[in-house]
Regions:
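Hydrophobic helix-and-loop "lid/oligomerization" segment in the mid-to-C-terminal part
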Residues: 2-25, 33-65, 69-71, 78-81, ...
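Short glycine-rich anion-binding loops that position phosphate/pyrophosphate groups of nucleotides
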Residues: 26-27, 95-98, 121-123, 240-241, ...
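Generic enzyme active-site microenvironment
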Residues: 22, 26, 92, 117-118, ...
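Active-site cofactor/cluster-binding pocket
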Residues: 71-130
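Glycine-rich, phosphate-binding/catalytic loops in enzymes
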Residues: 38-39, 107-110, 133-134, 187
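Short alpha-helices
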Residues: 118-188
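A glycine- and small-aliphatic-rich helix-loop capping segment at beta-alpha/alpha-beta transitions
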Residues: 41, 67-69, 106-114, 150, ...
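Short glycine/serine/threonine-rich phosphate/pyrophosphate-binding segments
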Residues: 29-35, 98-102
Length: 284
C-alpha cells in the first residue's frame, strides 16, 4: 500500500463513519477472523461498523468475538442492502474479485461508499478505491494486523481483536505450517499471545469440537483419497450423496484437503465437492 493511500485512509477514518465489512462467500476462518478483528477495531475507533457475510459460515467459528452482530445477507437481504447503500466506507476482505461475494456483488458495486480491499490472493481486480494486496502474506488476518499497525493504532488491539486475528492466521496456515508462515507471522502471533490471547482455547474451539457425523465424513474422504505419484498430486472427492449420508453441515469439510498434502511426496492437493442444489462442484 502506498504512503499516500495510508495517509488518505488515516484522514478518512479520523472521524466517525458508517462502515461495512464484507468477507467472501462461504466464509472460512481467515475471512471471518479478519472481518471481525477489523470490525472490533473500527468500533473502538468510534465508527459504526457492521460485518455482512454473503451467507452462513461454520458453527465452529460462531464463538468468535462479535459474531452475534454479524448479518447474513442471504437471510436478511433488505436490511443488508439498506446498510450497504448508506455506508461511507466498505472494506472487502479475503477476496479480490467482487463476484466472490456472490449476490452482494451488485449492491457493493453500486454503493457510493469508499471501497478498501485487503487481500492476499493473486491478481486483484481494480474495483476498490484503495487496495492493500500482498500475495506474500499468509493470511488476510495478518494483513489486518499490519493495516492497524499502518494506522498507528496497535494499542487498540485487545484480547477480543487478538482472538479473531489469531483464529484467521491459524486456520489459513494449517496451524502455522504452510511456507508463507514467516518469522514476521510468528512475531505477530507472539504479540497477540502477549496481549493475553489463549492459543489452546482457540485451537480447542476450532479443532476439538467435531460432531460424530463430521468424523465419519472425514473417514469417507480418506477412503476416497487418490494419489497420482507421478504428478506428486493427491485429490479427494465427495459426492452430494456422501455429504447427505453423513449429515453434512457448512464447514464440515474445512481442512480435509490438508490430509492430501500430508502424503509423502505430495506437492499439490485438491478436494472436489459436489453441490447439486447449487449446480456446482467446488474445488479447493
Amino acid at each position: 500500500m502506498k504512503k499516500d493511500d495510508i495517509s488518505n485512509i488515516k484522514v478518512l477514518l479520523n472521524t466517525p463513519k458508517k462502515i461495512v465489512i464484507v468477507p467472501h462467500k462461504n466464509p472460512d476462518g481467515d475471512a471471518m477472523g479478519s472481518a471481525l478483528g477489523l470490525c472490533l477495531y473500527l468500533k473502538k475507533k468510534g465508527h459504526i461498523a457492521t460485518v455482512i457475510a454473503p451467507n452462513d459460515y461454520p458453527e465452529f467459528l460462531k464463538w468468535l468475538p462479535g459474531n452475534e452482530e454479524v448479518i447474513n445477507y442471504e437471510m436478511e437481504n433488505s436490511i443488508s442492502e439498506n446498510i450497504i447503500s448508506s455506508a461511507d466506507v466498505i472494506f472487502t476482505l479475503d477476496f479480490n474479485i467482487l463476484h466472490r461475494c456472490g449476490e452482494m456483488e451488485t449492491p457493493i458495486k453500486n454503493a457510493n461508499a469508499v471501497k478498501i480491499m485487503i487481500d492476499h490472493h493473486q491478481e486483484p481486480d481494480s474495483y476498490a478505491d484503495y487496495t492493500y494486496s500482498d500475495v506474500n502474506m499468509c493470511s488476510t488476518s495478518q494483513m489486518v494486523y499490519h493495516f492497524i499497525e499502518k494506522m498507528e493504532d496497535l494499542n487498540y488491539i485487545d484480547i477480543a481483536i487478538g482472538e479473531a486475528l489469531y483464529t484467521g492466521i491459524m486456520t489459513d496456515t494449517a496451524s502455522f505450517r504452510f511456507p508463507l508462515t514467516t518469522s514476521i507471522t510468528h512475531k505477530v502471533i507472539a504479540q497477540l499471545i502477549e496481549l493475553g490471547v489463549q492459543k489452546s482455547k482457540i485451537h480447542d474451539a476450532i479443532y476439538d469440537t467435531n460432531s460424530f457425523g463430521r468424523l465419519q465424513l472425514l473417514g469417507c474422504a480418506m477412503n476416497n483419497l487418490q494419489f497420482l505419484e507421478n504428478y506428486s498430486t493427491s485429490y479427494i472427492t465427495l459426492t452430494k450423496k456422501e455429504l447427505d449420508y453423513h449429515g453434512f453441515k457448512k464447514g464440515d469439510t474445512e481442512g480435509f484437503v490438508n490430509y492430501g498434502l500430508s502424503l509423502k511426496g505430495a506437492k499439490l492437493a485438491a478436494i472436489f465437492i459436489e453441490h447439486k442444489q447449487e449446480g456446482i462442484t467446488t474445488i479447493d
